[in-house]
C-alpha cells in the first residue's frame, strides 16, 4: 500500500472581485452576459487553474495508482470566506464558465464586506451548512467505477488564505484536510467467476476507533475525534460492476476517511446475478496511517480464499477429468457422457500407490495440494467443523449455495494448537492426530483409516469466515462418465487409497478406501 498527494498546497487559485461602483458593475454585467448568471453586486471568487491542470478541486477527474490526483470543481460546490467582521460568509452562486475547463469556477458572495489584505477560505463539503464542522459520511455511494464524484458529499474539506494582489484581486490555494482510500479489487485465475460476479459494496471496519462522523473544523484541521455521529464503520455502496482480473484504475473504488492511524478490516460483498447467490469476502488490512490530503492505495485479491470446487481429476492424472470435453461435461444427476478418461489417456488415473507423483495437486510437498491423510486428521480433530445448509461456494464459474461444512483454516488450527503442532514435529503433513490427541502417521502404511467427525450446528458468522472455509457436500462426482450426486460428496487426498467422504444426512464425515472403477472427484487444495 502506498500513499500519494491528492492535491498539493498549490492546488487552486481564486480571484475575488469586490463589486463597488460602475466599473465593478460592468465586470459583473460582462460575466452575466457570458452566461455565468452572477447576481449584481456580488463578490466573485474566480477559481483559476495553474499551469498544471491537476491542481484543481473538488470531484476526482483522474487517479493513477501511486501518483497524484486530478480533481475538479462542481457547480454544486460552495466555499466559506471570512469577511472583514470575522464572520464566515457562504458563497451563494457557483458558475463554471467553460464546461471543458472545470478547473476554473466563479463563486459569488452577496453578504459581507471584503477589504482586507487576506481573508480565510474554507471548504467543508458539498451541501454543508457550517464553516466550522465537517461530516465524513459513514454511508458513501459510488455510482461509477473509477469515479470520485461523491468526494464532496462524502466528507472532503480544505482551507486556504485568500491574498490580495496588486491588481486588486484575491487569490487562494486550497489545502485538503480529509484523507482518502482507493481500493483496487481483482479476481485472479478464475476467468469464468470474474465474468459472472459483481461487487455490490465494500465495508471498512476499524478496531482502533472512529473513522467517520462529524468533526470540529474551527481550527482549519479536523478534530482528532468526532463531536457527533461517530462511526467505526464506513460502507461504500458500489455500482455492481465487473471485478477486474488485475489491479486496474478503471475498476477502482474511493472513500473519504478520517486522517489518523487505523487498524482496518475490509468486507467485500459479491453477488452472482445468474444464481442470485451472494458472498462476503473478508480481508484484514492491518494498521495504516491515513494522512490529510493524501490517498492510500489498497489492492484486494477477492478470490484468494475462494475455492472452485469443479476441478475434477482421476487420481493423480496429469490432465483434468473432462479436459477437452468441458462443453459436454454432465452436471445433472444421472446424466452421462462417453468421453470420460480411458487407459493411456493423460486424464486417466495413475497406477501407482501411495502419494501422487504426476500432478502437483496430489504431491504433498507442492505449495498447493489436496490434503494429505495427516492434514485431514487435523481438520477432523481440531477444525471445529460446523454444519451449514446454505453455504455459498464457487462451482462451474458461478456462486452457488447448498449444504456443507465449515472448517477452520489450517493456519488457524496451527495457531490454536501450537503445542500440539510442536509435538508433531511442527509439520502437520508428517504427523497426524488420532482421537484423544494421540499422534499417528497415517501415511506410514496402507491400512484402512476411518476418521470420523460430527459437525456442530454452530452458526458461522461473517466475522468467523476470515478463519474458516466452506466445503460443499452437494456437488456431483463421476463414476466413469456418469454424473452422481448422493447425500454427500467425495474429495481426493494425496494418497491413492483414501478419499474424504461426507454423509450429510447424519452429519458424519469419514475417509474410506478407494473403490473399484475410474472416479472423477474434485481435487481441492484446502485452506
Features from the language model and the residues they span:
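Sec-type signal peptide cleavage vicinity
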Residues: 2-381
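Short beta-strand element of the conserved SAM-dependent methyltransferase core
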Residues: 22, 81, 87-95, 101-109, ...
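Long, compositionally biased low-complexity segments
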Residues: 347-349, 354-356, 362-388, 392-394, ...
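C-terminal, surface-exposed recognition/capping segments
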Residues: 403-527
Amino acid at each position: 500500500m502506498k500513499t500519494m498527494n491528492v492535491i498539493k498546497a498549490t492546488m487552486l487559485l481564486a480571484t475575488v472581485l469586490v463589486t463597488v461602483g460602475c466599473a465593478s458593475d460592468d465586470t459583473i454585467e460582462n460575466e452575466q452576459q457570458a452566461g455565468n448568471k452572477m447576481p449584481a453586486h456580488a463578490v466573485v471568487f474566480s477559481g483559476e487553474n495553474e499551469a498544471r491542470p491537476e491542481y484543481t478541486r473538488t470531484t476526482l477527474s483522474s487517479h493513477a495508482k501511486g501518483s497524484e490526483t486530478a480533481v475538479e470543481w462542481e457547480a454544486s460546490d460552495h466555499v466559506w470566506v471570512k469577511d472583514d467582521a470575522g464572520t464566515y460568509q457562504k458563497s451563494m452562486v457557483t458558475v463554471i464558465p467553460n464546461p471543458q475547463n472545470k478547473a476554473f469556477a466563479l463563486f459569488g458572495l452577496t453578504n459581507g464586506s471584503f477589504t482586507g489584505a487576506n481573508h480565510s477560505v474554507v471548504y467543508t463539503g458539498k451541501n454543508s451548512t457550517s464553516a466550522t464542522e465537517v461530516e465524513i459520511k459513514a454511508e458513501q455511494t459510488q455510482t461509477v467505477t473509477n469515479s470520485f464524484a461523491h468526494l464532496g458529499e462524502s466528507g472532503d474539506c480544505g482551507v486556504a488564505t485568500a491574498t490580495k494582489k496588486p491588481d486588486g484581486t484575491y487569490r487562494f490555494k486550497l489545502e485538503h484536510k480529509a484523507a482518502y482510500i482507493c481500493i483496487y479489487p481483482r479476481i485472479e485465475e478464475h476467468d469464468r467467476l470474474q465474468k459472472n460476479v459483481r461487487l455490490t459494496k465494500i465495508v471498512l471496519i476499524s478496531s482502533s476507533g472512529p473513522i467517520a462522523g462529524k468533526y470540529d473544523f474551527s481550527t482549519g484541521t479536523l478534530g482528532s475525534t468526532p463531536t457527533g455521529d461517530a462511526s467505526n464503520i464506513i460502507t461504500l455502496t458500489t455500482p455492481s460492476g465487473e471485478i477486474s482480473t488485475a489491479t486496474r484504475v478503471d475498476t477502482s473504488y474511493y472513500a473519504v476517511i478520517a486522517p489518523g492511524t487505523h487498524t482496518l478490516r475490509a468486507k467485500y460483498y459479491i453477488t452472482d446475478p445468474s444464481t442470485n447467490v451472494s458472498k462476503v469476502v473478508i480481508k484484514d488490512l492491518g494498521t495504516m496511517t491515513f494522512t490529510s490530503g493524501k490517498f492510500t492505495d489498497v489492492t484486494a485479491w477477492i478470490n484468494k480464499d475462494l475455492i472452485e470446487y469443479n476441478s475434477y481429476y482421476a487420481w493423480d492424472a496429469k490432465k483434468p477429468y473432462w479436459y477437452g470435453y468441458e462443453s459436454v461435461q454432465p452436471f445433472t444427476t444421472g446424466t452421462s457422457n462417453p468421453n470420460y478418461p480411458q487407459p493411456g489417456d493423460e486424464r486417466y488415473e495413475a497406477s501407482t500407490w501411495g502419494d501422487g507423483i504426476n500432478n502437483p495437486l496430489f504431491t504433498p510437498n507442492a505449495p498447493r495440494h489436496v490434503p494429505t491423510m495427516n492434514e485431514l486428521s487435523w481438520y477432523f480433530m481440531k477444525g471445529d467443523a460446523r454444519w451449514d445448509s446454505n453455504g455459498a461456494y464457487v462451482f462451474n464459474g458461478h456462486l452457488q449455495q447448498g449444504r456443507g461444512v465449515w472448517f477452520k483454516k489450517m493456519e488457524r488450527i496451527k495457531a490454536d494448537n501450537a503445542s500440539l503442532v510442536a509435538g508433531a514435529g511442527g509439520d502437520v503433513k508428517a504427523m497426524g492426530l488420532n482421537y484423544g490427541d494421540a499422534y499417528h502417521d497415517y501415511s506410514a502404511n496402507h491400512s484402512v483409516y476411518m476418521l470420523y467427525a460430527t459437525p456442530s450446528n454452530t452458526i458461522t458468522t461473517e466475522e468467523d469466515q476470515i478463519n474458516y472455509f466452506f466445503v460443499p457436500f452437494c456437488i456431483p462426482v463421476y463414476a466413469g462418465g456418469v454424473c452422481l450426486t448422493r447425500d454427500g460428496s467425495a474429495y481426493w487426498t494425496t494418497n491413492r487409497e483414501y478419499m474424504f467422504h461426507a454423509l450429510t444426512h447424519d452429519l458424519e464425515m469419514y475417509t474410506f478406501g478407494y473403490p473399484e472403477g475410474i472416479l472423477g472427484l474434485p481435487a481441492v487444495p484446502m485452506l
